[in-house]
Amino acid sequence: MQQSRPATTPNVFNREMADAYDRRNSALAPISDCLHFLLRLVLADLPASARILCVGVGTGAEILSLAKAYPGWSFVGVDPSEDMLAVGRSRLEQADVLERCQLLHGYVQDAPSEGFDAAVSLLVAHFIKREDRLAFYSEIHDRLKPGGRFVSAEISGDLDAPEFPDMLEDWKRIQVLMGATPESLNKLDSTLRHALGVLSPAETEALWRSAGFGKPIPFFQAFMIRGWRASRT
């Protein structure tokens, strides 16, 4: 289905952010390494020549992880930040996998309309506003082959749950590792509630089902980062 451009959070992924993105996130390497390890496992039984859609591909981390493990796979990566794509293209070229990749500037609507064995979207969905989240998931669903896989990780949590204050303190510790300022830490609650489109796990799973996926299966959690996988029904 054709959807209007999603309402996203303000674009902070400029050239300065793109150049510093991987360095800034290196403090979270244990989390990202585990996430990518599990990503490779949950997609391990795809065809040897699988075609993978990477939504919000950024600097190409998931392509680098999957391309090394599965040398017959090809990738289409889409991202609204030209600066992030430029960094990603350079990394993929250095890793000698760029010839297996097509990188597109834009949103999921700008990706080829069908034929993917799997779609991957890591730490992207929470940048999509609540009112556009179903359309986002539906666009991904419609680009998969019947039975195709969707794997996603996003910031997710019930912000009104009694345990949320404790969850927030843990999340602040993550932000400190990434260089957060005292001012940004003080605003973190508001950022999660208003600047980002953070949904509860139950809301996310319900939207996946509404988009046409089978039952979402949780496969990853690190504080407020949660990952699910499901198949197109």
PLM-predicted stretches and their roles:
Residues 117-132:
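A short SAM/SAH-binding and catalytic strip from SAM-dependent methyltransferases
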Residues 134-146:
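A short glycine-rich, Lys/Arg-flanked "PGG" loop and its adjoining helix->strand segment in the class I
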Residues 147-155:
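Conserved beta-strand signature within the Rossmann-like core of class I S-adenosyl-L-methionine
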Residues 6-10, 15-32:
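Class I SAM-dependent methyltransferase Rossmann-like catalytic core
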Residues 155-210:
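C-terminal alpha-helical "lid/dimerization" subdomain adjacent to the S-adenosyl-L-methionine
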Residues 109-119:
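A short acidic, Gly/Pro-enriched loop at the edge of an enzyme's catalytic core
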Residues 53, 59-109:
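Class I SAM-dependent methyltransferase SAM/SAH-binding core
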